[in-house]
Amino acid sequence: MNSRTKALKITLIYPPGEQKISEPIPPPNMTIAVLAGALIESGHEAFQIDAEKDWFDKIQYSLTKKQTALLYDKDSVGAYVNGKAAKELAVKYDRIRTLLLNGLAVKKSDLVGITLVDIRAEPLIINFCALVAHAVKKEFKAKTVIGYRGLPKEGFFYLMRRYPCFDYGVYAHWGEKAILEIVNDISGEKAALTGTVARKNGKLRNYPGDGARRPYAPRPHYEDHILERYKADDARIFSSYNSDFPFAKKLIKKDKEFLVVPYAFELTCPGACAVCENDNKLRSDMKSTDQIIDELSKLKSRGVTGIYFVNSSFNNHYKTAEELCDKMIKYRLDLKWFDCANLRVMDERLLDKMRAAGAVKLTFGVETGSQRLLNYVNKGITVETARKYLEYSNKIGIWNHIELIAGFPTENARDIAATLRSMDNIKDFVDIYTLNPFYLYPYSRFYREQAKFGIKVVPYPPLQFMNFFYPLYRIVEQYSLKFEEIGGLSWEEKNAQIIGSTKAIAAKIDSIATFRAIGNEHLYLLMCLYDKLGHGNKELIRKLVRILTVKFKPYNLNFFMDDFRTSFSKQKDLRIFMPLKDTLFLGEPEPGAVPDVKL
């Protein structure tokens, strides 16, 4: 740390959201752990608050129904934090503010940071953040920062104009660097703010990103008190499922606690697929295998039994993946793990080593069953390759998860039919599906090389005129550019085709596996069953999972889900941004307004 900069006290908060994931027991958030690690290494004190867990475990029950209604009221919350609420209403919000601070056990801090990772356009997330930020400014005179690289700067301008309790908004790719510069700024030291919107002298100012990226994948610093809350024995795990059967009772031993945490060793990707925003010209941020083993060993020593890798892929580099597996086996890490796997860099030998090194579930980007489309998007695999390795992975006992995309540019009825046939051919080897309608992302190869792929992007008006927070519950970071197929479908026609393709593939998944198999990973359940029964009993594990997941209780619900007929609705997603002039923040269009989808 710069010797001129005094040590500050910084609190980092992961806020609650209603519709983030539906796991009965999710892993802890990695973002605040990464930021905390960087701050501690620079000599500051960092405190982590898992407000997501605090809210669903206890805080929500400390509020009356009227107080909960006020917390969800976007207009009243906005008036309160802007000092425009009527006196009687302000008193009510003061009480809520006190309940939140006490429930979260927020300490006096110089800076309070709230991550917006996974943000959806929902009142709970945004109002919670605004009320907490307002509270710490009132109680501690603290500065506040919100941040997430998935939200463009225009989104931060929008939020910070509505809520003056936010002092900084970080959209930089390298969040650790950005928050350290903010620390310098509030310390009165020279600061090179980067990828940050800052409130200066009552006005908002943008400090563009400098393009800097972290040299290596981030290292999380999880606090013990948070890890303790994510430990679960088999009894707790089974209690969230359809487990009132003799076989389940026989499996419960209460002799071990399970703990899954996120971790990454490579976020960059050498692939050149047209779909994602990856820039394969970037230098790899992969850690050395020795560093990975060292960091995983330290996590194990703290009670971690499973790793939820958030890499771009476990095996982007064959030799490195093989070396890592060999070391995981040699040093007897005995960690169960989950990760994405690259079909381009795969063979049976590597799959065997991944299994021996602890792989429980692998996610494969199959994308489509049309060889024409696989070639078109430069996926680098064949339909037969995907089938071959899915079959072998299943044979050796790995839980297979595939990702599919509906509505690629130029996709036609023959391509959809090929995908449906392929799904029939691999259904016996697949356990979980993820299905997404096609999004044309800014900075993807589709965007950068439009002529090559036979499309033409229809430009948006400037993003400052678009509503990032409409409709209600949209995933804020996910939006598609509109495009036309050159010599083919117009945007309106293509949009309808994407929706139709999504419906067709979703119906196929429902027919062969039911909607229960879409998206629900059941990390703790899988880790527990594989720990007890082993890879050699996958068929038994599959039967048990099918029975146990007939109903289950997500961590953020007070009831068991048992009707999954409407659980998949991505075909209804509004993938594009709508103009501010026609839409309400966190709501429906203005009365009488007709959003112009042809923009």
Predicted regions and their residues:
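Glycine-rich beta-alpha loop elements in corrinoid/cobalamin-binding modules
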Residues: 31, 35-38, 45-51, 91-218
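Glycine-rich, highly charged phosphate/nucleotide-binding loops
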Residues: 69-104
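Radical SAM [4Fe-4S] cluster-binding motif and immediate context
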Residues: 225-400, 421
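Glycine- and acidic-residue-enriched helix-capping/strand-helix junction motifs
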Residues: 20-32
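Structural recognition of alpha->loop->beta junctions
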Residues: 158-180, 353-362, 418-440
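Flexible glycine/acidic-rich beta-alpha junction loops that bind and position SAM and/or redox cofactors
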Residues: 19-22, 54-59, 151-157, 271, ...
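N-terminal [4Fe-4S]-dependent radical SAM core
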Residues: 2-4, 8, 19, 202-262, ...
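Radical SAM enzyme core and accessory elements
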Residues: 1-13, 19-22, 41-45, 101-110, ...
